[in-house]
Amino acid sequence: MKIFVKIYLFIPTVLFSVLTRAQDVDSSFKTPKFLSYDSLHQRDIVDVGQSVFRKKKVPRTDTGKESQTHVSVLPAVGYSLQTGFAAILSANIAFYNGVNEGQNISTIITSFTYSQYKQYILPLLTNIWSKNGKYNFQSEWRYLKYPSFTYGLGTNTRLEDGYMIDYSYLRLHQNISRKILKNLYGGMGLDLDLYWNIKELSPDSGTKTDFENYGLYPKETAVGPSFSLLYDSRKNSIDPENGSYLNLSYRPKLKFMGSDANWQSLLLEFKGYKKFPAESDNVIALWSYNRFTFGGKPPYLLLPSTGWDSNVNTGRGFIQGRYRGSNMLYLESEYRFLITSNGLFGGVVFANAETFSGRESTLEGNASLKTFDPIQPGYGAGIRIKLNKFSRANLCVDYGWGTGGSKGVAVNLGEVF
């Protein structure tokens, strides 16, 4: 039985040195009045470092300066069955382009991972709001050199069915949205997905894999425009405590633009947040992520799959790529609560459920709402450590369980959703 185990060992001295060098940025980080809270009574990892290494504590408060940028950096080493030992450096940049009423926080998130199995993982995710909130700019750029496990199509596969594949991957997705009404934006963009050096490394001998049956080619290209309708009433996307998010995205892939084939995809995503109890800082969060493909045949590696959303977070409790199919339905709920009243430590409990189009319907290209495989649930719990009390960036460490013996640790800089 393959068990997905991921353990991160943090490097406090390096983390502390990076964060203390950023304290000048912290002290000038100005929280807009509509987002302000009593930061003097809140504590984060930088405050802990100050209390240990500084004789005289320097209050980190709003100075009213124009600079409103904060950087959180997290170096770590990790281990998983999929990566072996890995060196990881994550960074989260949060800032406001203005202090007007209703101004949203802008974020830039990146990391670099190099693993024992010579995997390279380099994502860059941006969510930038203009000064007046009229425009929103989103980017999802990734480069991967990624030997990894795949398990076939549908949700009736077993962990023992997994085998290694290898490929290189470049994703460049860019989108710009314009405000239509309050919190409502319409947008368009351009997507490029390029795979090369695709190969199977350890398939069962004498058995044709789902990958081969579906279509295994050494190179795959998908190019096309994207059209989106976005509603976002959250004020802080790093650690939301209220508001909601709804994204409807249509992405056709077109041969005349350079795609290998014509096909289409539709994404319907919802996130909602509510304080519970209402007078507390505890939050109930709900996430629904649903992807559908139609009008052609997507590459195997671009089919909806566990853990392949833009933030690589669906399916806690399951290894990335555990399930795959033409269509995907996903639902997750999480309860976030304080452990310490100063906000330094928190906790979560979560549960999720996912289903995909079955193997035969995906292979035959006739998937519909009637051809979904059995639902696969997951659940777990985690801790939160406040890295920055101004941007509300948390270090998130979760342990999840899934069906069929799946289990593992998930680590994030910023909330999972």
Q: Model-flagged regions — what are they?
A:
Residues 63-73, 77-221, 321-322, 392-407, ...:
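Gram-negative/organellar outer-membrane beta-barrel architecture
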Residues 236-345, 350:
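C-terminal outer-membrane beta-barrel translocator/porin domains of Gram-negative envelope proteins
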